[in-house]
């Protein structure tokens, strides 16, 4: 196992992790921003008012993007397992 192969595997793992986390984080960010704007406009400062919609939005995003996320993760794991003999040496 060469240092280049370790770096390549690490880079691919980070790309997959970022691709899996990005949609959920963006949904939470956009939902939080919208709720914060509404709270500022109505002067309602309730912490649970921003927390519950974020959870619901992320849950919906998981349902919508779940098959794509699962496919991406399975493709990465299949590639990793198929290259295992070459990695071990």
UniProtKB/Swiss-Prot annotation:
It is found in: Cell inner membrane; Bacterial flagellum basal body. One of its GO terms (cellular component) is bacterial-type flagellum basal body. The keyword Transmembrane applies. It comes from Salmonella typhimurium (strain LT2 / SGSC1412 / ATCC 700720). The keyword Cell inner membrane applies. Keywords: Bacterial flagellum, Cell inner membrane, Cell membrane, Membrane, Transmembrane, Transmembrane helix. GO terms for biological process: bacterial-type flagellum assembly; protein secretion. Required for the assembly of the rivet at the earliest stage of flagellar biosynthesis. It is a multi-pass membrane protein. Belongs to the FliQ/MopD/SpaQ family. The chain crosses the membrane at residues 18-38, 55-75. It holds the Pfam family Bac_export_3. This is Flagellar biosynthetic protein FliQ.
């Amino acid at each position: 196992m060469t240092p280049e192969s370790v770096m390549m595997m690490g880079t691919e793992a980070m790309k997959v992790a970022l691709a899996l986390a990005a949609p959920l984080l963006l949904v939470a960010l956009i939902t939080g921003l919208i709720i914060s704007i509404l709270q500022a406009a109505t002067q309602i400062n309730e912490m649970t008012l921003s927390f519950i919609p974020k959870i619901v939005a992320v849950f919906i995003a998981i349902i919508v993007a779940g098959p794509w996320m699962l496919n991406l993760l399975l493709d990465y794991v299949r590639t990793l397992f198929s290259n295992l003999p070459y990695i071990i040496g």
